[in-house]
From Swiss-Prot:
Residues 162-384 form the Histidine kinase domain. SMART domains: HATPase_c, HisKA, KaiB. CDD domains: HATPase, HisKA, KaiB_like. The modification Phosphohistidine is found at H165. This is Adaptive-response sensory kinase SasA. The keyword NADP does not apply. Its EC number is 2.7.13.3. Keywords: ATP-binding, Biological rhythms, Kinase, Nucleotide-binding, Phosphoprotein, Transferase, Two-component regulatory system. One of its GO terms (biological process) is circadian rhythm.
Length: 384
C-alpha cells in the first residue's frame, strides 16, 4: 500500500472535527488509472468540505489480498470504508460517480452528527477498518512465508534424494573394485594379475575421489547458502533464459566470425534456482568460450535432461583447451594458465560460478583435451 495522503480539506484549511471520510482507491498499472488518480486528487484539493477526506491509493499488484478482502471484481475501484456502511464504486465513469456520491456521504455525516452518534460510531468504524487492513496485510505476509518454506522443504527433500542417487554409483563401483581386489590377492603373482590389481587400485581410488568431491560440494553448498549468497529460488525454464542470453551475443559471434550451435530441447522440465545467478554463470562461461576460441571457431550451448532429478547445461568451445592437471584448479580464485598470457584469466569468474552452482546443490566441471577445446558443464535440480 502506498503511504496514505494527508487528509484533504477544503483549500487546505484545518478542521476541528475528528470526523472524516475514509477512502481506498484501487488502481492497476494502466495509464488510465493514473489519470483517474490525478482527477480525484485534483477534485478533492479544490473541494469545500466541512469534513476531512482521507484518500489512500492501493496498487492491486502489490496488495492482491486487499482486492480479495473487499471482493472487488474490476479496477479502478473506490471503496468508502468509513463512516459505515461500506460503499464500493467502479466503472469507466468512476470520477463522476465519486462526485455524485461524495455529496450524499457528506450529508449522511451531518445527519449522524445531529443524532449525536456519529463521532463514536465513526471512530469505531475507522479503527475496525484499519485493523482489518493490518490483519489482511499480516495474513498475506504469513501465507507468502509459508509457501516459501514449503518450497524450501520440498527442495531439500529432492536434493537429499538426488545426492543419495549420485553417491550410490561411485560407492557401488568402489565396493566392486575392492571386493575384486581381495579375490585378486589370492591369485598367483603373474604379470597379468599384477596389472589387474593396479587397475583395480586406480578404479577404487577414482571412485573414492568422486565421492569425496560430492561430499565437499555438499559442505561448500551449505556454507555458500549461509554466508555468501542470498538465493531467490523459483521455478523457471532454461529454454527461455538461454534464448534471452544468446540474443545478447549475436553481434559478438558475428564480429569474431564464430560458428554458434545450440541444442536446447523444448520439452525440458523447469528448474528450481535463482534465475539471475544462473544467468551470470551462463554468461560467464559463454564469454570465456568466446575469449579463448580463435576466429572461425565454434561455440556450442546444449541443455540435457540427464535424469528425473537434474538438468545439465554444457558450453563447449574449440579453443586451446586446458591441461588435465589444471582442470580442477581453474575453479579456484586467481589461477592463471599459460594461455592466459595477455588475457584476463578465468580465475575469479569460474570461482564465482562454482560457488553459485554449489549453492544450488549442483555440480560444475570441465572436460578438455589440449588443442581440442573445452566443455564446461553444470547441473541444476529439476522443479517437481
Amino acid at each position: 500500500m502506498l503511504p496514505s495522503n494527508e487528509p484533504l480539506t477544503a483549500l487546505g484549511r484545518e478542521t476541528t472535527t475528528p470526523l472524516s471520510i475514509q477512502l481506498l482507491l484501487f488502481v492497476d498499472d494502466r495509464p488510465s488509472s493514473q489519470e483517474i488518480i490525478r482527477q480525484i486528487q485534483s477534485y478533492l484539493q479544490s473541494l469545500k468540505s466541512d469534513y476531512p477526506i482521507d484518500l489512500q491509493i492501493i496498487e492491486i499488484r502489490q496488495q492482491p489480498h486487499l482486492v480479495e478482502h473487499f471482493r472487488l471484481v474490476a479496477t479502478p475501484a473506490l471503496v468508502k470504508i468509513a463512516p459505515g456502511p461500506r460503499h464500493t464504486l467502479a466503472g469507466s465513469n468512476l470520477v463522476e460517480q465519486f462526485k455524485k456520491w461524495l455529496v450524499r456521504w457528506q450529508k449522511a455525516i451531518k445527519e449522524e452528527v445531529k443524532n449525536h452518534h456519529a463521532e463514536d460510531a465513526q471512530l469505531q468504524e475507522v479503527e475496525h477498518s484499519g485493523e482489518l487492513i493490518r490483519i489482511a496485510d499480516e495474513v498475506f505476509r504469513l501465507k507468502q512465508e509459508k509457501e516459501e518454506l514449503l518450497e524450501q522443504l520440498k527442495f531439500k527433500d529432492q536434493i537429499l534424494a538426488m545426492l543419495a542417487h549420485d553417491l550410490r554409483s561411485p560407492l557401488t563401483a568402489a565396493s566392486i573394485a575392492v571386493e575384486t581386489l581381495e579375490l585378486a590377492y589370492h591369485q598367483p603373482d603373474t604379470e597379468r594379475s599384477l596389472q589387474l590389481r593396479e587397475q583395480l587400485h586406480q578404479q577404487a581410488r577414482k571412485q573414492f575421489r568422486i565421492m569425496n568431491r560430492l561430499i565437499t560440494d555438499i559442505l561448500q553448498a551449505s556454507k555458500s547458502m549461509a554466508a555468501q549468497f542470498t538465493l531467490h529460488q523459483s521455478k523457471f525454464y532454461l529454454q527461455s533464459l538461454c534464448q534471452e542470453i544468446l540474443s545478447q551475443f549475436t553481434d559478438t559471434f558475428q564480429e569474431k566470425t564464430l560458428i554458434f550451435q545450440s541444442d536446447i530441447p523444448q520439452d525440458l522440465p523447469p528448474v528450481y534456482a535463482d534465475e539471475e545467478l544462473i544467468r551470470q554463470v551462463i554468461i560467464n562461461l559463454l564469454e570465456n568460450g568466446i575469449k579463448y576460441t580463435p576466429a572461425g571457431g565454434e561455440i556450442t550451448l546444449s541443455v540435457l535432461h540427464r535424469t528425473t532429478q537434474k538438468v545439465q547445461v554444457s558450453i563447449s568451445d574449440t579453443g586451446p583447451g586446458i591441461p588435465e592437471e589444471k582442470q580442477e584448479h581453474i575453479f579456484e580464485g586467481h589461477v592463471r594458465l599459460k594461455r592466459d598470457e595477455g588475457k584476463e584469466g578465468y580465475g575469479i569468474g569460474l570461482s564465482v560460478c562454482r560457488k553459485i552452482i554449489r549453492a544450488h546443490y549442483g555440480q560444475i566441471w570441465v572436460d578438455s583435451v589440449p588443442d581440442h577445446g573445452s566443455s564446461f558443464h553444470f547441473t541444476l535440480p529439476v522443479y517437481r
